[in-house]
């Protein structure tokens, strides 16, 4: 009785062997879907690099925009610039340096025929006050989110529509890195930090969002449709989470 049982087990084992290679394409398809997502992210990243997004951000000028902001306390920049009477002709400056555009971390989200791209960037700020010889170092972090989708026209053809592009409010952080701050500057720097958090997102959006619109406008609709079909077929459930950056973890002087 044992012999037929072993023969049956061996026979079933042999039947299972040809099935093994057929299981391989499924992980491959899942990987291809992830590759498609990263391909779309790479297209956006390469476009931002090609259009010198970092240089555009670095060339942002602050003085007029800070003073013109309705949220800025009256005379803030004027006080910053004048400081002392004998330095009235010397302007203070805020320069952007060390821009880190996280092209490798661009996240693409799908829902039916709707897409969302999340682009994280971080940079340093150097404040040179006219009333003080010390340079105050700060850093800023934010995530730009752009939405785009496929929409049918009156003839049933799909067109790419680009929606809102702005900084996610909860992602905007400005931190003061310099530790040796004179006590007389604490309140001023606190106000400046609050004002920068209000105006920086709009200033960065004005440089980055037009570039993203141009990049997305060149995408092939068939490619996007293919990505949507892949998403509908596999519906990945994992979500990547990023660790807080050094700037996000930074603290302002008390």
From Swiss-Prot:
Protein keywords:
Disulfide bond, Glycoprotein, Secreted, Signal
SUPFAM superfamilies cross-referenced by the UniProt entry:
Bactericidal permeability-increasing protein, BPI
Q: Decide whether keyword Amino-acid biosynthesis is in the record.
A: no
Give a GO molecular function annotation for the protein.
Answer: lipid binding
Report any Pfam family annotated for this entry. Answer: LBP_BPI_CETP
Q: Which cysteines are joined by disulfide bonds?
A: 165-209
Source domain of life? Eukaryota
Q: Where is this region: Disordered?
A: 233-254
The listed locations are: Secreted
Q: Repeat among the record's keywords?
A: no
Tell me the leader sequence span.
1-21
Q: Where is the composition biased (Polar residues)?
A: 242-254
Q: Which residues are glycosylated?
A: 36
- The membrane-spanning stretches of this chain are none
Q: Record's InterPro entries?
A: Bactericidal_perm-incr_a/b_dom, Bpifa3, Lipid-bd_serum_glycop_N
One GO CC term, this protein: extracellular region
Q: Which family does it belong to?
A: Belongs to the BPI/LBP/Plunc superfamily. Plunc family.
What's this protein's name?
BPI fold-containing family A member 3
To which species is this protein native? Homo sapiens (Human)
Gene label:
BPIFA3
